[in-house]
Amino acid sequence: MQVNPNPNKLPVELNRTSLYLGLLLTFVMGILFSSYFFN
C-alpha cells in the first residue's frame, strides 16, 4: 500500500461529498414521496 502525502485531505472530501449526496438523495426522495402521497 502506498502512503498518501496528505492522508487527511481525501477522506474529508469523500465524507463531505457522500454527506451532500446523502442529503440530496433524502431531499429528492422526500419530494417524490410527498408528491406521491399527496396526489
Curated annotation (Swiss-Prot):
Localization annotation: Cellular thylakoid membrane
Topology in membrane: Single-pass membrane protein
GO CC annotation terms, alphabetical: photosystem II reaction center; plasma membrane-derived thylakoid membrane
Major location category of this protein: membrane
Xref: HAMAP family: PSII_PsbL (MF_01317)
Superkingdom, taxonomy of origin: Bacteria
Residue ranges of the TM segments: 18-38
InterPro entries found in the cross-reference section: PSII_PsbL, PSII_PsbL_sf
GO BP: photosynthesis
Function: One of the components of the core complex of photosystem II (PSII). PSII is a light-driven water:plastoquinone oxidoreductase that uses light energy to abstract electrons from H(2)O, generating O(2) and a proton gradient subsequently used for ATP formation. It consists of a core antenna complex that captures photons, and an electron transfer chain that converts photonic excitation into a charge separation. This subunit is found at the monomer-monomer interface and is required for correct PSII assembly and/or dimerization.
A Pfam family of this chain: PsbL
Identification of the protein by name: Photosystem II reaction center protein L
Keyword annotations from UniProtKB, A to Z: Membrane, Photosynthesis, Photosystem II, Reaction center, Thylakoid, Transmembrane, Transmembrane helix
Subunit-level organization: PSII is composed of 1 copy each of membrane proteins PsbA, PsbB, PsbC, PsbD, PsbE, PsbF, PsbH, PsbI, PsbJ, PsbK, PsbL, PsbM, PsbT, PsbX, PsbY, Psb30/Ycf12, peripheral proteins PsbO, CyanoQ (PsbQ), PsbU, PsbV and a large number of cofactors. It forms dimeric complexes.
